Amino acid sequence: MLAYVFWHWKQVEITTKDYESRQRAFHAALGAAPPSGFLGSFSVSLSYAPWAAGGGDAYEDWYLVQDFSALGLLNEAAVSASRAAPHDAAAVVAAGGAGGLYRLQHGAVVRQPQHAYWFGKPEGMQYRDLFAQLAPVVDQVQGAVWMRQMVLGPAREFCVHAGAPVSGLAEFNALVIPLRQAWPALASKGMEPR
């Protein structure tokens, strides 16, 4: 499973209520007419991510797809047909944005994460050792490990999503970001939230 992760933030003069309403309308339109391979979407609001709004208030959308082919279909579908007007209405009030591509490496999707831990692989550590060390820590909180693909995106290489605080990540010097559910899985297609 892949996730297109899109960070975005509102224009100063736009109210949070209006901005989130437009975003919800787009997610709903995408869910009502999903492209092939689209598994669902969710979004959280956050602060302190240096790659989003300079660390200010921002949103982080997760668009889940089966594979790279489905990612291409999502790219086309997001701005066409019944999704075009809601997409454009949401985009016109955004002050900026950045995107990244992540693959689910371990665990299951956490549809309503409360905590995100962003980090890079420690120097000298092999990937197999990193995954072996992360697995029991992440399993304990029923979390998910996402790994950036093809160095696409401004954020760090790994993200651990969890519904509860995660201990045992000190070695990774993770940037810990508290999350707030901005809108639930409006575009869900059979994936149960954790």
Placement of each model-derived feature along the sequence:
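Macromolecular interaction modules
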Residues: 1-194
